[in-house]
A protein has these predicted regions:
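Conserved SAM/SAH-binding loop
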Residues: 151-156
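A short, conserved alpha-helix within the catalytic core of class I
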Residues: 179-195
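Short alpha-helix
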Residues: 232-259, 282
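A short SAM/SAH-binding and catalytic strip from SAM-dependent methyltransferases
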Residues: 168-184
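Conserved beta-strand signature within the Rossmann-like core of class I S-adenosyl-L-methionine
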Residues: 192-209
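Short, glycine-/aromatic-enriched active-site segment of Class I SAM-dependent methyltransferases
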Residues: 215-232
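Rossmann-like AdoMet
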Residues: 1-104, 108-149, 162-165
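Core SAM-dependent methyltransferase catalytic element
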Residues: 258-260, 267-294
Length: 294
């Protein structure tokens, strides 16, 4: 595992956030009445724990001890598991309509979604930065229908590999866009629309009020401390309404949206009360668009 430890030292603070959902999926899988079943996440975290236990990184050491954040640890795990489950369902619904469709996971990290929703026909692309894909290749192998692309989402050359397909495409972005600025979100979305008209985009978004709170140093530092994150990690991009992307240009059509509290999941417990507050209910949520031709 020395190779993995060296690779982890080469990624940015923001890329390192991929470890948090990974550990949440593993922890939830091993819980009573799990909401998701991600044995691959369990396998990976068990291998990482032996390295992280003696790491110089506070985040690594905390993860090895099963401490994902400073407070509401179990609820946070459930929160991310519900989010993961919903993205899985979006993919499954897409494949029920187009069984031989193409799914592109932007900022994939160490996601094992392909193994959970593979219907035997889907063409799958996992895209992330080269240093992240280098780590990913230590745990995953490419197959005839599952591919890895080592690229920044801003380097549009990666789209040329996807462009070879003639099938319908779904792009998903879980835990990615909020760490970018608006122009860095808008630019690839418009390019995807231009190159792949008719595709779907499902992405997680942050509410603008959360972004404004994190602009204050006190709250930004608290956010970083709660999750044991590096000083460069903060959120930049947010929206106020699910239809905000439609203002970026013609052909972007809002289809639907979903919040964590829409499932009324019992394992959330007292956090379900947040559904009573419009602001808290949509502090972070998922939006679904179709990117039509211009």
């Amino acid at each position: 595992m020395e190779t993995t430890e060296a690779s982890m030292n080469n990624i940015t603070d923001i890329s390192e956030t991929l470890l948090i959902p990974l550990y949440c999926r593993a922890r939830e899988t091993q819980s009573k009445n799990p909401l998701i079943n991600d044995r691959k996440a369990v396998e990976i975290t068990e291998k990482l724990n032996s390295v992280f236990a003696t790491s110089t990184s506070p985040l690594h050491r905390r993860l090895a001890k099963g401490k994902l954040r400073r407070s509401a640890n179990k609820k946070f795990t459930v929160f991310l598991a519900i989010r993961t489950r919903k993205f899985d369902r979006y993919c499954q619904e897409f494949l029920s309509r187009t069984p031989n469709g193409v799914i592109v996971e932007l900022g994939c990290g160490l996601s094992s979604r392909f193994s959970r929703i593979d219907n035997g026909a889907v063409e799958w692309y996992d895209l992330d930065l080269p240093e992240v894909i280098a780590i990913r290749k230590q745990f995953f192998q490419e197959t005839a229908r599952s591919h890895m692309i080592a690229s920044s989402v801003f380097d549009f050359q990666w789209m040329e590999q996807i462009a070879k397909t003639k099938n319908t495409i779904l792009f998903i972005a879980e835990g990615l866009l909020m760490y970018l600025c608006e122009d860095d979100v808008k630019s690839p979305v418009l390019e995807i629309q231009h190159r792949f008209p008719g595709c779907d985009l499902v992405c997680e978004v942050e509410n603008m009020f959360v972004i404004n709170v994190l602009k204050k140093e006190r709250w930004r530092k608290k956010f970083q401390q709660d999750y044991h994150l590096g000083p460069d990690v903060t959120m930049h991009f947010g929206i106020r309404d699910g239809k905000d992307f439609e203002h970026w240009g013609q052909g972007i059509r809002f289809l639907d949206e979903w919040t964590i509290f829409d499932d009324h999941e019992k394992k959330l417990g007292w956090m379900n009360l947040f559904a009573c507050s419009k602001r808290l209910r949509k502090a972070q949520w998922i939006v679904h668009y179709q990117l039509q031709s211009l």
